[in-house]
């Protein structure tokens, strides 16, 4: 085992009891915590129960619906309630091969189960008999460690890594939850089905460890976990995350405005939820833009101005996105935005210049794979409500 000491950099931590009125009370694009976390009481309780009972869990929803925030909230509550429970989280966003996956998994498990770097070194010596990892760590136990393996060795003996959490849990009398975000990225690995078989063959035998797997590519996650021919079929409790209802958004928005000494009319809060289609990311972003424009009281007119500014702000992104769509895909989107329901009917095909019913099927599948459309039980919807608004009113000019 090789150990490299990383130069320690100062870490400044700040605490606060109350937000100043100059700081926005809305959060998006990062993990929501404490007062930023919105509702999800039932889902949180369900997830905490699964963690405490070591039930494998698969969480599926479109992008930016708050999966990561929900998992972080449930993990925090579960650890607070159970002194023997440890949660380790890894994100596969930038992980594109098995080698990187094994390194990330090892780092995650070691950090979650050791409070001192001496414990990390001890665990490596105890649980890695056939592998010789290279470890880089800081003298500060709160700082990151990094692990590297000889890929030739790992290919021959991946068992030690895949069983590491289970062995540590048995040794220390712990329960461990391994949370893996962007899990669908394993589909990009070499021979992904074989890799999935390897993961399941190990993980299904673990008795002191459970896995929470989630990701932002809904259609890919569905294929991995609901396809009877795939290794992870029926691996655990399958949860489909729903949107937060407008009834829950309204009191949240009013309270967040009130916390900074401002007010928002009920009609304005309703308008934010409607324009954002109750999409968690966009509700928070539109609320923030409305808050910026509010001196004392936010009105529906304030929200309308904020929405127009947000659409304009994102228009260049939407232009680039639409430029990468085919004419047939755009024609299908226009039909959907125009309220057409029988997309393969002769009248709709002719009206919108769609070549054939087969073209509808191909375009629909392509748009789902591009994360533009979502198909829930045959009902098509846009994953991005602001993009849908821009397409309808600015691009197609549908009135």
What are the language-model segments listed below?
Residues 237-248:
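Conserved AAA+ ATPase "SRH/arginine-finger" region at the nucleotide-binding site
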Residues 250, 254-316, 377:
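Amphipathic alpha-helical "lid/sensor" segments that cap RecA-like P-loop NTPase cores
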Residues 10, 14-24, 312-399:
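C-terminal leucine-rich, beta-strand-based interaction scaffolds used for sensing/assembly
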Residues 62-65, 69-177, 192, 209, ...:
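P-loop NTPase nucleotide-binding core
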Residues 77, 289, 366:
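Alpha-helical DNA-recognition elements
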Residues 170-172, 176-179, 185-191, 197-229, ...:
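Sensor-1/coupling segment of RecA-like P-loop NTPase cores
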Residues 1-62, 80-83, 386, 399:
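A short, basic N-terminal segment
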Residues 40, 68, 279, 384:
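Short, conserved phosphate/pyrophosphate- and ester-handling motifs at nucleotide-, phospho-/glycolipid
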């Amino acid at each position: 085992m090789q150990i490299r000491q990383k130069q320690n950099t100062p870490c400044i931590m700040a605490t606060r009891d109350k937000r100043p009125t100059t700081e926005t009370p809305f959060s998006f694009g990062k993990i929501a915590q404490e007062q930023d976390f919105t509702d999800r009481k039932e889902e949180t309780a369900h997830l905490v129960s699964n963690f405490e009972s070591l039930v494998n869990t698969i969480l599926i929803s479109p992008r930016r619906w708050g999966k990561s925030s929900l998992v972080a909230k449930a993990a925090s509550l579960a650890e607070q309630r159970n002194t023997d429970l440890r949660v380790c989280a890894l994100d596969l966003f930038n992980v594109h091969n098995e080698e990187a996956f094994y390194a990330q998994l090892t780092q995650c498990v070691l950090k979650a189960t050791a409070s001192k770097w001496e414990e990390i070194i001890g665990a490596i010596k105890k649980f890695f008999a056939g592998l010789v990892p290279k470890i880089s760590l800081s003298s500060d136990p709160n700082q990151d460690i990094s692990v590297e393996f000889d890929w030739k060795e790992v290919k021959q003996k991946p068992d030690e890594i895949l069983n590491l959490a289970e062995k540590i849990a048995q040794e220390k009398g712990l329960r461990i939850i391994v949370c893996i975000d962007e899990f669908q990225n394993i589909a990009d690995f070499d021979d992904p089905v074989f890799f999935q078989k390897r993961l399941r063959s190990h993980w299904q035998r673990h008795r002191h460890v459970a896995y929470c797997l989630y990701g932002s590519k809904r259609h890919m996650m569905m294929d991995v976990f609901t396809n009877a021919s795939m290794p992870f079929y029926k691996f655990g409790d399958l949860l489909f995350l729903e949107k937060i209802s407008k009834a829950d958004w309204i009191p949240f928005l009013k309270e967040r405005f009130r916390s900074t000494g401002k007010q928002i009319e009920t009609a304005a809060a309703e308008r934010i939820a409607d324009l954002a289609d109750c999409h968690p990311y966009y509700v928070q972003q539109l609320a923030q833009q409305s808050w910026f424009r509010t001196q004392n009281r936010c009105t529906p007119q304030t929200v309308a101005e904020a929405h127009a500014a947000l659409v304009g702000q994102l228009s260049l992104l939407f232009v680039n996105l639409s430029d990468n769509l085919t004419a047939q895909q755009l024609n299908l989107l226009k039909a959907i935005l125009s309220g057409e329901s029988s997309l393969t009917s002769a009248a709709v095909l002719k009206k919108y210049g769609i070549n054939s019913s087969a073209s509808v099927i191909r375009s629909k599948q392509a748009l789902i794979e591009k994360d533009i459309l979502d198909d829930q039980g045959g009902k098509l919807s846009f994953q991005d409500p602001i993009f849908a608004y821009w397409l309808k009113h600015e691009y197609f000019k549908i009135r």
